[in-house]
Amino acid sequence: MLAMLLCTSLAMAQSKFNVKGIIIDKETDEALIAASVQLTKEDGTYVTGKATDMNGAFEMKNVKKDKYKLKITYVGYQPKELDLDLTTQKEKNVDMGYLTMSTDAVMLEAATVTAQASKVQVKGDSLVFNADAYRLPPGSALEELIKRLPGATIEEDGTVKINGKAVSKILVDGKEYFINDKNVALKNLPTNIIDNVKAYDRKSDLARVTGIDDGEDETVLDLTVKKGMMNGWMGQLNGGMGTEKRYNTRANINRFTDSESYSLVASANNIGDRGFGGGGGRGWGRWNGNGLRASKELGFNFATETDKLETGGYIWHRYDGNDSWSQSSSQNFVNKIGAFSQSVNQSYSSNASLSAGFRLEWKPDSMWNIIFRPNASYSRNRGYSYGNSGTYDSDPAEYDEKKLDEAEQAFGDRAEVSDSEIDDIIETIVNTRNSRQQTYSNNKGMNGELQINRKLNNEGRNITLRMTGGFTNSESTQLSASSINYRASTGMDNDINNRYYDTPSRSRNYSIQATYSEPIAKRTYLQFSYRFNYRYNKSDRGAYTYDDLTYSDLVNALKTHRYDVAGAVDELMSLGHEQLYDNSLSQFSEYQNFDHTAGIMLRIVRDKYNLSAGVEILPQHSVLNYKYMGKEYNDITRNVVNFTPTLNLRYKFNDMTNLQVRYNGRTSQPSMTNLLEITDDSDPLNIRMGNSKLKPSFSQNLRAFFNTYDAEHQRSLFSHAYFQLTQNSISNRTYYDESTGVSTTKPENINGNWSGGLGLGMSTAIDKEKYFTIDEFTNFGYTNSVGYLDPVKFPDNDKSTTKGLSLNQSLSFTYRKDWLEASLNGDMTYTHQTNNVLDNNTFNYWDFSYGAELNIMAPWGTTLNSDISMNSRRGYSQASMNTNELIWNVMISHSFFKDRSLTVSLEWNDILKEQSNISRTINAFQRSDSRSNTIYSYGMVRVIYKLNIFGGKFGASGGNQGGFGNFGGWGGGRPGGGGGGRPGGRR
């Protein structure tokens, strides 16, 4: 009986099989990630199914002996069906090898989408975003795609962050694109050519060559160009005219191959470089910045690669003009109530720049590596601004704005008023200031870097020599007029300051570094390095005053010669107004820094983890010659020692799950001018003092990142956490004169500044067919900010402490199938902050939005893109800032010709004209609310022409922009995740 049971058990065990294989593109051999593999019986009954992993592989375990159909589907590819007969199979493991799939050439006419492309995946240390999973308006640039990526943010200053990491460069197929200017790619690269976007930490040149992590990683976005668009020329012409005299033109032509790339880009617009929508429906997007901006750009970029030589370079010209208005109100924490201030400013600027860079990497043989990076730049900047401000005993937000303006005018004129309400406002005014100025500057510089590496064996022993050098010359001038009015009760006369500054400055630097790496055990290395760095800076500011000029006289000259400092000065001289040299306001400084850096680094490389740890010691010798405020200091020297510990751990759980932990510390010295006992009263309302007793500060940063991906469910999880602590940070102790509103600050060391936070993101499909997806991102942050107070006013506790808690939650629910994409989304930011100084010491404010987005793509070439959101604010100081704004954006477009190469669109941003630009900041010293002008509502007609001349069979494409070209089409397109090519060679 036992033998019979054993035989039966063995027979049943051998009647089950494990079926595996790898799905690849027939033409490119590229792995197809998240392809759907289903096993059915011959009558169609479903048995089991899998999605391929990052290598295109699948495995089905414990399949019973029978005859089956193996069905494979993938977006943009022809379905594949194979017969699988296990009744005659003897081996338990059935390897079907490489199964190829062909792209669907008639997908435009009769596409039946059977799977949806995953939005984001994890591959090793990289987050890989599938561009075809995001439906974008026709003609969209890269920035429009980045805005929609889970965990990605574009901040007000243009900084791009992915999962909390700031992006420093953008690459195209692994090659640097305009080297140091990521905005060129964001504003100009068309999204229809992009297959996927990979975010990862790229090693420095030194680390990549030596294999030893030096801790100088930079987060990059690496764009993979669609294979069908390689080996040919492609371009896009995009022109638009709109209401409010708005225009937007953009042109680019590109060639990308496996070994070279060329790009020519040009643009001109006055819409602030914004794309369609401007953030409507997706929370508080202020990426179009402050002010009414116009820009013009022209640039060329190239990169080439052979077995031994890589070259790349760019030349770039840009012009920017900006008309910026802002209003701010603040509460300074100087007493129990706070000192209140309000200001209005208007500025105009005109900036032009020209830059060029080059990169060469030469590998004469397997043992040598030489990298050379020179670059040069020139810029010219002109500015003109004017504004007024006031300081108050109570919050001016409580008063009518018109009467507040009248009260400030009467206060400045010291005039009698009959309106009791205006008289009450005047009683609260401490001082007012009116100012106007114009500036001019030009800057030119050049620098270069040469790195030479020699491997001494193939086990990790090598030596590296690295040299850098550069210089910068600049010239700036400023002509300004300022009038300050004080309370009559102070007995102080109004302060009139008419000044001219002429400031030439020079700087130069060079460094030399030697690095030696030694293997001390199997896959364990020790690196020694030494670097000498010399820096020289010289600035000689000449200050001149016009004592015989009234404030209004100089203002009139500034108005007449806007943007022309030299013209205004010449007019004043022709009218007999003499410049008087002011020795106390003139400033001369000459720095010399001699830095030595010695470091040691240990790196351990294992299959599951990489660990590097090290420390650098930085002795520094500085010499300063300084003259200011009538005092002169010659050959002031300082000798200090800084140190920087680092730790970096990367742990790989599997191909789709990884953890990274990074720690670094850094010693920072106070500036030598802060150490000088000088009282700077050049600004009568803000007096600054020096402090010779300042100590160095030490900052510690700990960051952790975790990513994982489930291919079967298209589920990505990504998270980050951070903690920052600064010991002996330099803070300003503020002494505030309540009668005049004059603040006197003195730098002092303080402890207690720290912050921490946690971010968690998820993108997942929630149904079997992957039509429904949820994207979620949560950010939590806490800050503890401290500063010193006037000990006379606060004898018991002279520290101001502001504690802040912030929570941000964004959620998006999307349905995506064939010709339709619809989403519901929301975004909420809650901030709770307390301060120990004020009587009313709690601040709670909310920014939240909720809305919907709709994208319809008809098969005849018409697309509709629309989003609507309700954006709300609560808890701001002024009632006019606590708003509900219904933002609605819409675009309708139609593509012409068989290849959809010509598209005409009509778009309207902020149809209801309700958008505004408001922000709040709080720290240990103040709470500040501000609003500014920017580009809001306008309509525009665009014409977009896509020129694609390929070496292959593909023509013009619509890609992820909702068109119906050979890439993307109705449901996305070629393999998401790119770079996931099959391992090894074809068997």
Language model features: what each stretch is:
Residues 53-62, 159, 185:
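Short, surface-exposed beta-strand/beta-hairpin micro-motifs centered on an aromatic residue
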Residues 122, 159-207, 220-227, 260:
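Periplasmic plug
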Residues 24, 36-40, 73-77, 91-135, ...:
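Short, acidic, small-residue-rich periplasmic hinge/interaction motif at the N-terminus
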Residues 17-25, 56, 97-99:
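A short, amphipathic beta-strand motif
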Residues 42-45, 67, 71-83:
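A short, solvent-exposed loop/turn motif at the edges and junctions
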Residues 180, 203-245, 259-987:
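Primarily recognizes Gram-negative and organellar outer-membrane beta-barrels
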Residues 42-57:
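Short, acidic Ser/Thr/Gly-rich low-complexity loop/linker segments typical of extracellular
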Residues 33, 59-67, 75:
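Short Pro-Gly-centered beta-turn/loop motif in secreted/extracellular proteins
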